[in-house]
Design a protein with these regions (language model features):
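ATP-binding/phosphotransfer module of carbohydrate and carboxylate kinases, centering on a glycine-rich
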Residues: 3-4, 8-10, 53-168
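Phosphate-binding/catalytic loop of phosphoryl-transfer enzymes
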Residues: 1-66
């Protein structure tokens, strides 16, 4: 309702997690199950952080970006594993990585990581609705932080986004 008032459309949330629904102007009539950060949450900060950290731990991310990550977070690979597997709220920890990556969008590796994450959201979530016939609007910290890239990915699907808000 916050994004559409009395208008029908597809509402999408991209933050720590992700979700989407079709709102008919009065109520939510369809929802694609989010799946959480382990089984879904495509496009979210947690999934972006998960893929980046996986690449960091395997030495696949660019050396400069990895070095900056370890310096800024003051964390070792073992502490990364501890934060993900043994501490509370690993999804929140993973999501904090997305804010770090926002400073590196000019790096081809980071840019492709973001693009892939957002494309997966559109493919696995948005495309399950009648998306060509309704407006699609986004809310959430990740959607807002990556708005230019989000608009680019939406354009690849023939979608023009008119609203991207940080908070509802």
């Amino acid at each position: 309702r916050g994004l559409f008032k009395c208008e029908a459309g597809i509402a999408c949330i991209l933050g720590t997690g992700s979700n989407s629904c079709f709102y008919n102007g009065k109520i939510i009539v369809k929802n694609v199950r989010a799946g959480g950060y382990i089984l879904g949450d495509e496009g979210s900060g947690a999934v972006l952080g998960k893929h980046f950290l996986s690449d960091v731990l395997k030495g696949l991310a660019p050396k400069e970006v990895m070095a900056d990550f370890f310096e800024k977070f003051r964390i070792s690979p073992n502490e990364v594993m501890e934060s993900v597997y043994n501490r509370p709220f690993p999804n929140r920890f993973l999501s904090t990585i997305s804010y770090f990556l926002a400073d590196y969008t000019s790096d081809d590796y980071v840019y492709e990581l973001i693009i892939t994450n957002l494309r997966n959201f559109f493919t696995r979530n948005v495309c399950q609705y009648d998306y060509k016939n309704y407006p699609i609007r986004f809310v959430g910290s990740l959607a807002y932080s990556y708005a230019p890239i989000l608009r680019e990915v939406a354009g690849d699907f023939g979608i023009e986004l008119d609203v991207i808000e940080e908070t509802p």
